[in-house]
Amino acid sequence: MAKKKTSSSMARSQLAALLISLCFLSLASNAVGWSRRGEREEEDERRRHGGEGGRPYHFGEESFRHWTRTRHGRFSVLERFPDEQVVGAAVGGYRVAVLEAAPRAFLQPSHYDADEVFYVKEGEGVIVLLREGRKESFCVREGDAMVIPAGAIVYSANTHSSKWFRVVMLLNPVSTPGHFEEYFPVGGDRPESFFSAFSDDVLQAAFNTRREELEKVFERQREGGEITTAPEEQIRELSKSCSRGGGGGSGSEWEIKPSSLTGKSPYFSNNHGKLFELTGDECRHLKKLDLQIGLANITRGSMIAPNYNTRATKLAVVLQGSGYFEMACPHVSGGGSSERREREREHGRRREEEQGEEEHGERGEKARRYHKVRAQVREGSVIVIPASHPATIVASEGESLAVVCFFVGANHDEKVFLAGRNSPLRQLDDPAKKLVFGGSAAREADRVLAAQPEQILLRGPHGRGSVSDM
């Protein structure tokens, strides 16, 4: 009898222990779940406020990642464009990057597996290219744009004694879309020389030199890493050989050389700002890459008239100032998780409608809805505007706005301005106006379309309250 009681007691104890364990496991699971939910909520909050992932078609400074960062300079690369955030924009294979070099900084020789198009935001420097069996040395300064072909070995330096050298660049990877690498022939621990990946036998045969000598040259540890500082006399020596046309160039239309956007006449200007551009007709290397570069200097309180590009997707990087942009978009309704769910539902509805049209002829009708994409922008912001998407950029009341634009797919592209003196809507003939606006409203439409006497760069929406980041 005692044995039965003992056995029963042990069974109850084991059952109690099991129940307690299950309770702890449940609590732990809930804690993990709460933690993960909290992380997701924090992530959603960051996205709503322009953090990682940002809002659709807009990326802030926090979306950049430092590839190199020393006291002498930084090289930062924007995260890859997520397809769900730039729907309709053919830019997934491109990357945006920013290079900043301190006074008298020197950048170690390297090459990218990507074509590079850059714009000098600030300062001056010397850029040396080693390619096709020759050396080309260029003096570049603020306002210059230039193309560097993939695979060219490049080294550069900030030639100013007190100003930083800052460059904004667009990279077009040639191996893997959206992914590029930098290769250093000379290095140590950071950066590592790519020659360190080869066997000693191969290197000794290739250079006809003993391993010990090769290590001294190619794998020597250098202080400061990829970006170092150079004595003033060495910077002067580097500057002596550089030119605006590229020493050793052929002088042909295919010659690589810097082109000044701000040194040429703007293609449009008025009291509200200036617009500059460098096209493929002026730079053959841009045409080959199907790219174009533009610069917009918008006076404070002014705006670019609502417009779209017929073929090109615009990648706009804010250089200076602040303001906001708005865009009409059929793909998304703003930003955040709720909008993504709505987008998915809308996508499902559209698929059903399209299937219905295929099955039942013309009885189905596609719903056309355009949503407002809007975000505040400041120095370092990146905006993506797909082809045919009407959009505008507005400078704040307090300061002017400078924006450099890279146009992807620019060959045969046209800009269409929808408001102002050059709006195509003004060209509607009278019968069309009566059909479009209604007979009684045709005259009123004429008055509305003719009310704006200016074009392209216009007076902004003054006196309508502050712009909130919706």
Swiss-Prot record:
Q: What positions does the entry give for Zn(2+) binding?
A: H347, E352, H360
Regarding protein family, the annotation reads: Belongs to the 7S seed storage protein family.
A GO CC annotation given for this chain: extracellular space
Chief location bin: secreted
Q: Which SUPFAM superfamilies does this one have?
A: RmlC-like cupins
Q: How do changes in temperature affect this protein's function?
A: Optimum temperature is 55 degrees Celsius.
Which coenzyme or cofactor does it need?
Zn(2+)
Identification of the protein by name = Cupincin
The leader peptide range reads 1-34
